[in-house]
Swiss-Prot record:
This is Myrosinase-binding protein 2. It comes from Arabidopsis thaliana (Mouse-ear cress). The lineage of its organism: Eukaryota, Viridiplantae, Streptophyta, Embryophyta, Tracheophyta. Expressed in flowers. Detected mainly in ovules and styles of immature flowers, but also in pistils, styles, stamens, petals and embryos. Not detected in leaves. Induction: Not regulated by wounding, dehydration stress, methyl jasmonate, salicylic acid or abscisic acid treatments. Residues 2-151, 156-291, 334-477, 490-633 form the Jacalin-type lectin domain. SMART domains: Jacalin (SM00915). Residues 296-334 have a biased composition (Pro residues). It comes from the Eukaryota. Transmembrane segments: none annotated. Belongs to the jacalin lectin family. GO terms for molecular function: carbohydrate binding; thioglucosidase binding.
Amino acid sequence: MSEKVGAMGGNKGGAFDDGVFDGVKKVIVGKDFNNVTYIKVEYEKDGKFEIREHGTNRGQLKEFSVDYPNEYITAVGGSYDTVFGYGSALIKSLLFKTSYGRTSPILGHTTLLGNPAGKEFMLESKYGGKLLGFHGRSGEALDAIGPHFFAVNSSLKHFKPQGGNGGSAWDDGAFDGVRKVLVGRNGKFVSYVRFEYAKGERMVPHAHGKRQEAPQEFVVDYPNEHITSVEGTIDGYLSSLKFTTSKGRTSPVFGNVVGSKFVFEETSFKLVGFCGRSGEAIDALGAHFAPLPAPTPAPAPAPAPAPAPAPSPAPASAPVPAPAPTPAPAPAPPNKVEALGGNGGTIFDDGAFDHVRKVYIGQGDSGVAYVKFEYRKDGKRETREHGKMTVLGTEEFEVESDDYITSIEVSVDNVFGFKSEIVTSLVFKTFKGITSQPFGMETEKKLELKDGKGGKLVGFHGKASDVLYALGAYFAPTTNSTTPSTPSTSKKLQARGGNGGASWDDGVFDGVRKILVGQGNDGVAFVTFEYNKGSQAILGDRHGKQTLLGTETFELDYPSEYITSVEGYYDKIFGVEAEVVTSLTFKTNKRTSQPFGMTAGEHFELNEDGYKIVGFHGKAGDLVHQIGVHAVPIFTNYRCVF
């Protein structure tokens, strides 16, 4: 449901109404010496981007982009005034406010003091609702403009934000459900929240506040499970949060239970969205609940079949039917191996996954202060963080897709200032015989974390607070004693480019649906890939950093179209130590994309005859330094006609 706010400006030009989309990613505004002449809007609807343009494209262009979908526009402002010789008002300037508390530069004309020129206006939803579309009037210029904002549907149960009036208002809207919640703290307050919503087969993230300490997360088994209750406390700011689900599970308490308590809960409803206020912390939090769908009626029982005539006696020589085959035994559950270390801190338990792809280790003054684990589950990437990150940063250990961790050497010690032993160092060993460097300070007391059966490490548990006190693990039986249980048909082609940035690896999927390439001043600033796994579209992480220069998209006609080759260039640029990728071009079984970026430097091509590309890996920092691919054989079905 949406709220159409009246347009501001003049009454000439032709009326337009873009309607309602899922969100706005980018706005480009053009101006001449008098007024705003042109607006171009990039909308998103069901995972696809659509462009709408109004006015006449002339004069100087300026762009404003949001960190979509995490960030969204919550207010549309600007100014309008009568233009000499035109006989009516025109839009003189535009500006936008977002859910991150940001305000765009003034796009258009300003006074000598830097304010919008003309009569100012600000259009926003009552509760910080998301901008979903524009309407207005235009011709040779932009005569008038108004927004469509998200509005609470009457069928929803809306809980107004509880807390203070600081920060900026935001409203994520209503989705199909909630997949995951991440909560970060800064001292005794909740400073950051990130919600991963479900919309059809897609995951839509929205983040609010300022990330300080490493966030903790609560994962919902969507669509089989939903959140039924949100409980928290307010002590000036949001101080704690707790969630209860339809399966009777209750999350840990995120934060400190101090201040006044609130509960969002409605019988036969489920949580589908959040709203609130935030700046440096979460000032207030509200929620949207939707009614549960009516249960599907049980089918009417089929009529009983007529009794069959009695069979004639079988001849004595009739063969005895073979016994039914014995069903294959269910896979053995993972083995939970006890945590090694001290007794301090708070218990955490990530559970078991399909694979551990990467481990990040952060050092403190006395030992391991922080760990982050990157898991794979049903083709999806999930992360868990524990401890507290320090200014000393993190190091990482990456596990190849056809390898797995078999054991960990854990060094522990009694350190002054801590009531029990803490973990001071970690060393990882894999099935392929790889041994990592020691992460931290090794001590005389070294313990080995393994299950004694050659199992594959698939999850972690332990104890942590400001440091890592203890670490344990889940080990799953391997399906083959000599070969890791990963697809043997995929090939990982070496990444090309410079040696800067941090390594990343999206892994192997069924195919690629869409590619987003962000431009920088001198090279490719970031890449994001949308993959397909089974019946789901999975949006990968952003690798690199978004800039104001915008994003270009290459969308495939999946599943009939697939990528066969990636070409590009990398080069040394001023001010960056390692070479960066300057251009990318994608070839499919049907066509070739435009070059994204500048074709300058060393040329490379990533392909394998008879293979298609189903995943990407590489290195990135503020720019993309390297890119490589995962490829699998192309299987074609043939039909013989006689």
